[in-house]
């Protein structure tokens, strides 16, 4: 192996559920990456790689499809002891795999990789009876912090005085099941009001230029997600997250579920003046596991093998 392609995982900070209606979502790429390279005897493809092969054959051609058929993907960094963390591993793997195939035939370009991966990932999800926003594919393609709305990607700069950290609930959430459960309650006034509040909070986070404004937006987003769960009668916010939120309030910090909620990764935001050890103590005290994660500015990339 002389090179490999890689793509980052993601955490959706705000805009969950509402993004499916065209509201903005704020998503950060994180430094757990899926890696892909070409091998002579690849393992059986996942449903996402099978969809990617079909899309690449259709849109790029037989040579690139043949390269993709030789791709092996390692996404173990996006899991913990075999349990998915909710970092968008299928999207990162799809982006990395297509990146590897296109690089192998001299056609690598992030915008092309991203477009093909978005189509492939959506087709694979549709076969499962699910529908995603595409935000995780966008984060894996472009890296950094982005505003994702209706398929459009805009870089955002989070306030430098805002410190982000992450924790794992210990519970694996099934995004498709949660989204279907919430979707089944659309039309209830309280559900629609919560979705509008999520959209407003996400837009406010995108425009925040100070840590105070960002924390206010994230707190509002967390409350709106809890309201959505109550209105839809779906368990979106685990009790441990409610406990952590209460413990962080005296520190001026905020915790909220990410993505579909129900488990997976929790985001914690605090002013940089707050001691990281105080945040870590609160995380552990609430029964959550601190995660070593940081925003990854790199999107899909080709790297020479060491």
Regions found by a protein language model. Name each.
Residues 1-8, 12-14, 18-20, 27, ...:
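C-terminal nucleotide
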Residues 30, 84-110:
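DPxDG-like acidic metal-binding loop motif
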Residues 87-89, 255-262:
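Short glycine/threonine-rich catalytic loop with a Thr-x-Gly-x-Asp
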């Amino acid at each position: 192996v002389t090179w490999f392609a890689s793509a980052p995982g993601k955490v959706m900070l705000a805009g969950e559920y509402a993004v499916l209606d065209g509201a903005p979502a704020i998503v950060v790429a994180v430094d757990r990456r899926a890696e892909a390279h070409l091998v002579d005897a690849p393992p059986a493809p996942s449903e996402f790689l099978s969809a990617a092969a079909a899309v690449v054959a259709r849109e790029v051609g037989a040579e690139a499809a043949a390269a993709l058929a030789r791709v092996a993907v390692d996404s173990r960094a996006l899991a913990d002891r075999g349990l998915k963390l909710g970092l968008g591993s299928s999207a990162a793997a799809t982006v990395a795999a297509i990146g590897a195939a296109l690089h192998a035939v001299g056609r690598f370009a992030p915008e092309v990789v991203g477009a093909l991966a978005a189509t492939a990932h959506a087709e694979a999800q549709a076969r499962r009876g699910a529908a995603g926003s595409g935000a995780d594919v966008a984060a894996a393609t472009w890296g950094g912090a982005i505003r994702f709305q209706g398929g459009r990607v805009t870089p955002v700069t989070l306030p430098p005085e805002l410190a982000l950290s992450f924790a794992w609930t210990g519970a694996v959430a099934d995004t498709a099941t949660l989204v279907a459960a919430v979707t089944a309650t659309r039309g209830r006034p309280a559900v629609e009001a919560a979705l509008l509040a999520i959209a407003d909070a996400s837009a406010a986070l995108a425009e925040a230029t100070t840590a105070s404004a960002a924390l206010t937006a994230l707190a509002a987003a967390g409350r709106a997600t809890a309201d959505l769960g109550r209105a839809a009668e779906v368990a979106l916010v685990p009790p441990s997250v409610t406990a952590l939120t209460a413990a962080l309030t005296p520190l001026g910090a905020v915790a909220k579920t990410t993505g579909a909620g129900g488990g997976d990764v929790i985001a914690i935001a605090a002013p940089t003046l707050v001691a990281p050890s105080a945040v870590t103590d609160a995380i552990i005290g609430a029964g959550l596991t601190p995660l070593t994660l940081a925003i990854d500015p790199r999107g899909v990339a080709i790297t020479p093998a060491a």
